[in-house]
Amino acid sequence: SGEETRRKSSAKNDVLVLSGKKKALFLREIKCLFRNQSFAFNSVMGSVVTPLIVVVMYFIGLKSPTEQTGQALSSLANGFSNVGVTFFYSLMLLCGMNYTASLAISREGSTFCVLRYIPVDFSEILKTKIKVANLVSYVGVVLVCAASLGVTKGDVANVLPMTLALFVYAYAFNSICVFRDLKKPNVSWTSPYEVIKRNFYPMVPMFYAMGLGIAFMVIMSVIAKYESAINIKLGVSLFWIGTIVIGVVIAVVVNVTMKKKAQFFFDRINVN
C-alpha cells in the first residue's frame, strides 16, 4: 500500500541520514586527531615503534626467560616462549599506551562544546572515538604480526594467535582509555604540551597492560619450560583461548559500564 511504501521510504531515509552523520563524525575525529603535530605524533607512535622493537629485539638477540636458562625446547615451545616477549611489549606500548584513546576527549580542548550540539547521541560520539583509536591500534597490530612473521621465518602457529589476542586487547584497552579520559578530561589546555608531557593520567593504562603482559609472559615461559610434563599443543591452545576470553570479558564489562555512565560524565564536563 501507499502508506507502507511511505514508511519504508522514511525508514530508509533515516538510515541514510544516520549513516551520513556517522561518516561525518568519523571524518571530524580524524581531523581532530591530526590537526596538531604533537597529538598526531604521540597518537601513532605506538603503532610505529612497537613493530620496530620486535625487529630490533631479534637482531640484538634478546632472549625469553625460558631461553635464558639454556633449556632445550621444541620448536613450538621455543617459538611460544619468544612470542611471549613480543606479546608483552605489544600489550604495553601498542595497547596500553595509545594516546588516540587516552586523550580522546581531552584533545578536543576548547572545541569540546561543539560535541554538545552535534545532532547524535553521545554514545555514537564515543563509539566513533573508539573506532578511530582501534584503527590506529589495528594498523600497529598488523605491522607487529608482519614483523613477527618475518623475524620468526613464518612461525604462524605462534604469531597468529598472538595477533588475534592483540586485536582483542587493543579494543579492550582503547575502551578503557576513552572511558578514563571521559571521567577526567583536561579540555582547558592552552598547549598540547599540557596534556601530553605534563599529564601522567593518560599513561596509567600502560601500567595495567604492563602488569598483564608480565603475567602472561611468565605463564608462557612456565608452559614452555614444562613442555615435557604436559601436552604442549594443548597448553598453548588453552593459554591463547583463556587470554582472549579474559580480553573479551574486560572489553564487555568496560563498554557496558561506559554505556550506563557516559552521559553523566559528559554532562559534568566544563570548558573554562
Task: Identify what each model region corresponds to.
Residues 1-113, 122-272:
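Hydrophobic alpha-helical transmembrane segments of membrane proteins
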